[in-house]
Amino acid sequence: MSLLTEVETPTRNGWECKCSGSSDPLVIAASIIGILHLILWILDRLFFKFIYRLLKYGLKRGPSTEGVPESMREEYRQEQQNAVDVDDGHFVNIELE
């Protein structure tokens, strides 16, 4: 039984499901599409930053260095590393008693 295709209706004897055990191809297709939609939605919410970054920039990791002399490549790498390095002098150590 799928929660996506069940329809409960009141009868004299209580509640019962009309579509229980249905082998209608339309019901089966709707169930499969619903389950796939749910899976894709969950994956999108979990990995949306990665997915959209991949769509926007592709698999590029940074600007191309093709045709650039090695000395300039090294200078660029050093600038990037300096931008990432953190100066420990900006932090204040607080000790709780």
UniProtKB/Swiss-Prot annotation:
- One of this protein's GO BP terms? protein complex oligomerization
What does the record give as the organism's lineage? Viruses, Riboviria, Orthornavirae, Negarnaviricota, Polyploviricotina
Organism of origin: Influenza A virus (strain A/Equine/Kentucky/2/1986 H3N8)
Further remark: When the channel is activated, one or more imidazole moieties of His-37 probably become bi-protonated.
Which molecular function terms from Gene Ontology are attached?
monoatomic ion channel activity; proton transmembrane transporter activity
Just give the chief location class.
virion
| Protein name, entry field | Matrix protein 2
Topological domain (Intravirion) residues are: 44-97
> What's the entry's take on its domains?
Cytoplasmic tail plays an important role in virion assembly and morphogenesis.
